[in-house]
Amino acid sequence: MDNFHLIKIIGEGTFGKVYLAKDKSESSHCVIKEISLTKEKEASKNEVILLARMEHPNIVTFFSSFQENGRLFIVMEYCDGGDLMQRIQRQRGVMFSEDQILCWFVQISLGLKHIHDRKILHRDIKSQNIFLSKNGMVAKLGDFGTARTLNDSMELAQTCAGTPYYLSPEICQNRPYNNKTDIWSLGCVLYELCTLKHPFESNNFHHLVLKICQGRVAPISPHFSRDLQSLIPQLFRVSPQDRPSVTSLLKRPFLETLIARSLYPEVCSRRIQSHAHMENMAIGPTACWRVSPWSAAYLQRKFEAQQYKLKVERQLGLRPSSVEPHPNEGEKLQSHWEETKFQELQYRKNKMKDQEYWKQLEEIRQQYHNDMKEIKKKMGRELKRVVKFEISLDKCISEEDTVQENEAVDKLNATLSFEDGTKFQEHRCKEEHEDYTDRAFEELCGPEAEGFFQDVIAAENRRQWDAGAPHTLLRIMAMADVTSTCPTMPDDGQVIVMEGSVENGKQWWLDVPGTPCALAAECACSGSLSASKGETVMIKPQLPKEDQEKVEIATGIMVDDEQLEPGSDEDDIKFEESEDELRSEIIESLEKLAASTEEAEQAPSSSKNAEEPGEKEKTNLPVKKLQ
């Protein structure tokens, strides 16, 4: 580690940490992967061996490895574009173009083909293990920590390895698998590029396994081509034998045209040269990917030398135009070469412009996100409020209360059953009814309802009818200043002659027992009143004409104690009459009674007039005959 300068930690993998470092001797950036030998000794050695064997433009380049303090450090190529998962997350819902998706897919497939040709299973192909370099234009496959080498192309592996979202059905079902499990994972990566989400998602691992075993995914957007839409279902076939291999994928017409653009120019020239000498030379599997840096320049110099030789021979006359089978062939070749060179220059210029454009677009997008974060932070500071809590240290909270509170919280976190849901609905309906009642009460409590409440309070404070016998009339008669005289015509027809003048007549006693109230109390509301002295005489009250007939029918009925009991609600009439009205009616009846007595004293014949209907009322009063 002394030869490297560690800059920062850029990630943590399955078996250790990953550092961004700088080589002190070459001053170039690199990635150092730290692996603990005590935990994953075999896996770390396997990764070093496999990376040392991999030499491909679409596989992360291996530089060196060393051990230090019981740890293994692997020095690899640094990809400045990050991994593919980070690139997908930066899209924020904006879909990739189909050309970009297919370009990355072809490059990943080429790297995977290079692995499968060497009988190696990656077993952990995912977007986090695919790295981007050269401004995101080149995709490279990395992280061979879970890779395994097979002894035969027909051999099957049985170890469960990989990331749950990218597991194949045969691994989930604990069945043997081969290189077709990497094809399933490759389909998951392609689906993420098309939809920006996982093909199989679930919060539960058991449900996720069930979805993977079914192999059903939602179709991608119809804006993509039919070739791409039909390719994804083929990669997600449940049976491994039905899935295509990497070689058959790259032979598809719409993918084969992109291979030339995905490879470097020197790789293309090397492939052309290798095909030309395929019949005479036995080229190893790795030779086609080893490219000499001077091959393209050599071909160009050879072509220029041939053209210069033909030109000199023509000028010297050593090679006339008639000798040539095609006189204009040299000119055609020269024009063709110039045209291809011009096209190549234009392609490079356009590529540089595209790279600058994407770089500027990425800077603008990053600046926009930074500005939005600052605005949200400012808004959060403005909306932030302080909440103060006051805790009394004198009062001790019992443990039972805390246990009860925790139980209440647990009940809220628990799932509601059917009975709990029914009770919750009933309680909710009751609360809504109470809310409506409270709203109605608030409306009544408004300024318009103040008079209504005053009337209700006044009605509650009014005197009500008692359950006993009424004494209102008797009390008024007891308080009134009344004088009584004897009638001149008794029932037996004899005339009572009073001694002396009217002023010397017998007066009512002022004692309380002689009053009608006391007599009524002593007689318990009987039909007749007895005076303390003298004989008892029934005096009929004077009634109006319209009630005379009713009184004549009811005169022969004696009043019993049962009739004085309070009647039912149907017998009560006019409860709204006030005491003032009753008092005024009683006073009027008493005045009429007094006037009738005065007329009886002045005219002896007034007894006849009293018998006429509707003039006077007869009242039973106690009288005493004069001797």
Swiss-Prot record:
Residue positions of the active site: 124
Gene Ontology CC terms: cilium; sperm flagellum
Compositional bias per record (Acidic residues), positions renumbered to this chain: 563-580
One Pfam family of this chain: Pkinase
Cellular compartments annotated: Cell projection, Cilium; Cell projection, Cilium, Flagellum
SMART domains: S_TKc (SM00220)
Name of the protein: Serine/threonine-protein kinase Nek5
Cofactor(s) for this UniProt protein: Mg(2+)
Spans annotated as Disordered: 563-582, 591-627
Record's keyword terms, sorted: ATP-binding, Cell projection, Cilium, Flagellum, Kinase, Magnesium, Metal-binding, Nucleotide-binding, Serine/threonine-protein kinase, Transferase
PROSITE patterns per UniProt: PROTEIN_KINASE_ATP, PROTEIN_KINASE_DOM, PROTEIN_KINASE_ST
Family: Belongs to the protein kinase superfamily. NEK Ser/Thr protein kinase family. NIMA subfamily.
Primary subcellular site in the record, as a coarse category: other
Biased composition annotated in UniProt, kind: Basic and acidic residues: 609-619
Ranges where the Protein kinase domain occurs: 4-255
Enzyme Commission designation: 2.7.11.1
Binding site for ATP: 10-18, 33
SUPFAM superfamilies per UniProt: Protein kinase-like (PK-like)
Listed GO MF terms: ATP binding; metal ion binding; protein kinase activity; protein serine kinase activity; protein serine/threonine kinase activity
Gene Ontology BP annotations: positive regulation of striated muscle cell differentiation
Enzymatic reactions: L-seryl-[protein] + ATP = O-phospho-L-seryl-[protein] + ADP + H(+); L-threonyl-[protein] + ATP = O-phospho-L-threonyl-[protein] + ADP + H(+)
